[in-house]
Every structure is written in structure tokens, then in C-alpha cells.
UniProtKB/Swiss-Prot annotation:
The keyword Lyase does not apply. It comes from Macrovipera lebetina obtusa (Levant blunt-nosed viper). Negative results: does not show inhibitory activity toward alpha-2/beta-1 (ITGA2/ITGB1), alpha-IIb/beta-3 (ITGA2B/ITGB3), alpha-V/beta-3 (ITGAV/ITGB3), alpha-4/beta-1 (ITGA4/ITGB1), alpha-5/beta-1 (ITGA5/ITGB1), alpha-6/beta-1 (ITGA6/ITGB1), and alpha-9/beta-1 (ITGA9/ITGB1), alpha-4/beta-7 (ITGA4/ITGB7) integrins. Monomer. One of its GO terms (biological process) is cell differentiation. Residues 1-41 form the Disintegrin domain. GO terms for cellular component: extracellular region. This is Disintegrin obtustatin. Keywords: Angiogenesis, Cell adhesion impairing toxin, Developmental protein, Differentiation, Disulfide bond, Secreted, Toxin. Gene3D superfamilies: Disintegrin domain. The record marks 22 as: Indirectly maintains the active conformation of the loop. Is a potent and selective inhibitor of alpha-1/beta-1 (ITGA1/ITGB1) integrin. It blocks the adhesion of alpha-1/beta-1-expressing K562 cells to immobilized collagens IV and I with IC(50) of 2 and 0.5 nM, respectively. Potently inhibits angiogenesis in chicken and in mouse model and reduces tumor development by half. Is 25-fold less potent than viperistatin.
């Protein structure tokens, strides 16, 4: 992976890493994709 909220320095962030957070909920990286599940961007 090269870009995305779940990518850092061309590597996937670990599963469970917060990729998007609001005052009501958080979404987490899966460790298998550079995209954030349900990320609104």
C-alpha cells in the first residue's frame, strides 16, 4: 500500500489501529487494506 488512512510508510497499519474517529464512534484498520472501513472520505 502507498496511500490511505491505514497505510504508513508503504506498510499496512496493524489491525485495530484507529483510522477515523468522531465523538460518537471510531473505525479501525483491518490490517488487510489501506482503506478505513466506513471511512467517509
Amino acid at each position: 500500500c502507498t496511500t490511505g488512512p491505514c497505510c504508513r510508510q508503504c506498510k499496512l497499519k496493524p489491525a485495530g489501529t484507529t483510522c477515523w474517529k468522531t465523538s460518537l464512534t471510531s473505525h479501525y484498520c483491518t490490517g488487510k487494506s489501506c482503506d478505513c472501513p466506513l471511512y467517509p472520505g
